[in-house]
Amino acid sequence: MGFLEKHSNERGADMRIGLPKEIKNHEQRVGLTPDSVSELTRRGHSVLVETNAGVGIGASDAAYVAVGAEIADDAPSVFDASEMIVKVKEPLAEERAMLREDHTLFTYLHLAPDAAQTADLVKSGATCIAYETVTDDDGGLPLLAPMSKVAGRMSIQAAANFLQQPNGGSGKLIGGVPGVAPAKIVIIGGGVVGQHAAEMAIGLGGNVTILDRNNDVLDHCESRWGAGVTTIYSTASALEEQVAAADVVIGAVLVKGDTAPKLVTVDMVNSMQAGSVLVDVAIDQGGAFETSHATTHTDPVYMVDDVVHYAVANMPGAVPRTSTYALNNATLPFTLALADMGPRAALLANPHLRNGLNVVGGKVVEPSVADALGYELADMDATIAAIAA
């Protein structure tokens, strides 16, 4: 089926789709661009957009109206009138209170480390599909990848900023200058985040080391950058040695849908030189450092034993134009399928979209979330069959 070809419509009716304004701290992304809304309205679906939802990407209310959307004064109006809610970040408590059993929620969720959110979604009865666990034919995570690329690149920008002495850092320039050594950048995890962090760091002239436990990943990184990167198989002793010597450590580990492993211990942080910088890109899934806790764009860093910690949970929200369009490029085919076919038929037809289903009908169907939070794992097929067409 072509990328924008209309799917068969089991529902026999077109869908009412809601686009609320994001309310997380300094979150300027939006779930649907005007171009994406245009694709939906051309198919006969109705889209209700909260006023100023797109202002962060330069999309005015008028731009949405021009492609067939209607504008609502507030979020309750959007939730009340919609069947499917399309967002970027996980719903905050005031948004979760507006979810109903007949809602489909399509957004990032990151439930494994978030017991409160999971409990509220279970209580709502809504069909909750997480971008970050949707898969593809290659075993990848296509809706997580765009933001992982952005976050990986931003991690080095953040590190360069907070290495500066006025910002609490040691006063080193990532690339050094002739006659002065560059900063040592240690990247834990060689996946999408890690590779894009490495690309930025190498481009700035940093001394880059990648640790991973997948030899194929290490081979790929070495083939890609050659002498520009050092690759090391990640063991506890190797990690201790590299972290102690690092000026910057990037936490780029990922376990699909699960909490991130705490690979950097308190003792490792204590071993680092004053003014070193930790950037925890895994903070959405609980963080890769024992000393991590989530921060915001308003107050992005804190110090532990004179080591700068940057752990902003929505890093790509600071570059909303780039990240919103990159995200929509990936999510639009799935959004169209859900709207055209209805959630039940779309989930039954597409195993990759089905892997994104985390909570439905008051039950948890994502194994990593059930394991992390102690929920009984419900049968996926039975819960999907119970969704209204």
PLM segments and residue spans:
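Glycine/serine-rich phosphate-binding loop and adjoining beta1-alpha1 elements at the start
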Residues: F3-N9, R16, E22, A93-K184, ...
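An N-terminal-biased, well-structured beta-alpha scaffold segment characteristic
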Residues: L4-E5, G12-D14, L19-D120, S124
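General beta-strand structural signal in soluble alpha/beta enzymes
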Residues: L19, L48-T51, I71-D73, F79, ...
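Glycine-rich phosphate/diphosphate-binding loop of Rossmann-like nucleotide-binding domains
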Residues: P20-A59, P166-G251, V301
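Short glycine-/small-residue-rich Rossmann-like dinucleotide-binding loops
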Residues: E83, K89-E90, L109-H110, T235, ...
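Adenosine-phosphate binding glycine-rich loop
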Residues: E132-L173, I283, A288-A389
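Rossmann-like adenosine-cofactor binding region
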Residues: S223-D305
